[in-house]
């Protein structure tokens, strides 16, 4: 229901002959659908439908922006760039278009924001954090005023900055993460209902960096709860993944860590991000196999214990 005005704007635009505005409205509708966790398969079908319309009407600018979103989905769904899912040109966005776009601020910002999604999702946290260092935290807000992607971009850069701080031990990354966290907290205070799960995960990352494990665990669990309640499948997956990595690297609770990572892979796959799910499973295959081996040993031990009890009982009855 909240997206209905964008569909109405699309209809009004075509009825009045303002097809440019109509198609920009539908582009924003597609972006919101992505942010809200819509199934990637369903979203891809909508993108392809409206892209054909944009190209038929020769609306090049909005078609280019929509193509960047299409490229993002193609990579996530394992339909393109299988060898390197963070490469941001291919089936939907040609290398030539990509090179041209890099020289145009508005289009370049569009590429940067969706490319940043891939960098965070595929664990390229230092690269993502360095982009923030290069462009500044308000780059997207200055080049694409009022785009809803500002919320997600700030959140993902914050996650990557805290992750980069933990990977490198460099506190300046954590300071950048705190800048992103502070911005989101201000939005929450002003009544934005769409970023509370972002706030919770950044709280968890901040507490993890500070070594406050109990507080971090509570915030990770809150991020998972809020993401799940809101239907944000991708954010549920990311929060679960970050929680799993937190346990493996910081609390050394391998059982909980493996469980959370397996849940994350399941959530990624349910959303349609098969490339991401497979990447996560490959990266953690050793931990997964160790967990399976441990579970098997526990089962065998339990079986032996029960069998021994049974035979002891029979002997006792027979005596």
Label every PLM stretch briefly.
Residues 27-38, 249, 283-296:
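Compositionally biased, low-complexity linear motifs
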Residues 1-39, 45-58:
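Hydrophobic, small-residue-rich alpha-helical packing segments that form membrane-like cores
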Residues 21, 45, 49, 238, ...:
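Low-complexity, compositionally biased segments
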Residues 41, 47-290:
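Helix-coil-helix junctions within alpha-helical repeat/solenoid scaffolds
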